[in-house]
Amino acid sequence: PMDVLDRIKEQVEGNPIVLYMKGTPQFPMCGFSARAAAALQDCGVSFAYVNVLQDPEIFENLPRYADWPTFPQLWVGGELVGGCDITLELHATGELQKMAKEAAGEDATEG
């Protein structure tokens, strides 16, 4: 079986945008995850997500991998952006929308 750290590496490097969250965007299981997912959805790009409650291995190991202790965790372009606060701040300034569109390979100036 693939080592959990290899799985995480594959997820963050194989997807332009990954949100590690408690629950799913449709059914978030914590307020912070809900707000981070809503901010991302508002950017209008598709993103990958991992429900860490259904993946205890990732739940236990991601904080070590990233040196970031809490969830949600937003990864864009293989880099850790941060948690809920940072995601909402970036969304408020319009920076999240730009990052998301660039990562998704869309021209941020369009639409």
At which residue positions do the language-model features occur?
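Eukaryotic intrinsically disordered and solvent-exposed regulatory patches
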Residues: 5-6
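Local sequence-structure signature of Cys/Sec-based thiol-disulfide redox active-site neighborhoods
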Residues: 9-46
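Acidic beta-strand-to-loop metal/phosphate-binding motif
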Residues: 20, 73-77
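Thiol-based oxidoreductase modules, predominantly thioredoxin-like and allied folds used
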Residues: 44-60
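Thiol/disulfide oxidoreductase modules built on the thioredoxin-like
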Residues: 64-70
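Non-catalytic, surface beta->alpha helical segment in thiol-disulfide oxidoreductase systems
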Residues: 76-107
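Intrinsic disorder/low-complexity signal
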Residues: 109-111
